[in-house]
Amino acid sequence: MTPTRRVVTGIVDGIDVLESDGPAPNSLDIGPVAVSEVWWSERGHRTVGDPCDRTTPGFPLEPPPGGASARIIRMPGIPDGADLDSTWLRVDGDDPSTPGMHATDTLDFMVVLDGSVVLGLDDGERVIGPGEYVVQRGTRHRWRPADEHGWTYFVAMLRPDPTVSPVDGSVRVHSTGDAPVRRVITGAPVLDGAAEVHLANGGFTMTDMWHTGGPLRRAAQGGDPDGPWALEPTAGGAWFRQWTLEPAPPSDAGWHRTRTIDLDIVLRGRVRLDLPGGITTDAGPGDVIVQRGTDHRWTALGDETLVVATVMFDAVW
């Protein structure tokens, strides 16, 4: 797999800049499996200027307590004549009686970019297709390809920190709604259906997949937002969302700045990112933009609706 293109913005000496634009440096090919690590965080108390890349060797499965990782992973399809039970992705320490079945002490935000995958849970299997979301809350699970074609997915893994103080972050129990986006939320019971919270404003929509409600103390923590809609996460929290934008001329009203680290993954369409001073870059499907507290605006290009998955982490300046 070609290493994932990653665009990183930042603030240098008070000026909004495009810090880098190129392949994610921590990339790994293991036979037919390819991994690009697009972001890594060692701690829960984040600043917008924190480094994006891990400097330690190896590819640890889980980040440290309070930390988070984000990766794009490419998996092969089912080989000709293969027994399906042999195609489950094996993980060190998984259940030998149920190949690939494992649990991590993480809250995982996952979206399929292309292809299809089977998610195996204790209550059965579900096929997850392109543009569909999974919120994996520390439960037992496993993965295998759905067909002979490969599949690519993005996953952000958030590691709880049991020492943080609980915060009332205005979240409520998640439920099925009528937003035109499918999400699967693991737990007891599993929720599989349309997302509930969906904001539409002209040519822009925002669909909420998950809010942690504050610093992450447990992998199962969070739910749907409760109360007035807000752009930024609760202090110390993280949000998982999808937003769409219809093609239109650039607008001065589109400029904005948030006190967050945003991981934006283009699922469909093309987008132009503008920063002050005439800095601009275009991005397309599979590209990742790490947006770190800069003033910026988005413009959808061409004639196709822009669809972007985003993970927003609260941060300080």
Where are these regions (language model features)?
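A short hydrophobic beta-strand segment most commonly corresponding to one strand
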Residues: 108, 133-142, 148-166, 262, ...
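Glycine- and acidic-residue-biased ligand/ion/polar-headgroup-sensing regions
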Residues: 97-99, 105-122, 259-276
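Structural motif
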Residues: 116, 140-142, 270, 295-297
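Conserved short histidine dyad/triad with adjacent acidic residue
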Residues: 53-56, 68-104, 138-140, 160, ...
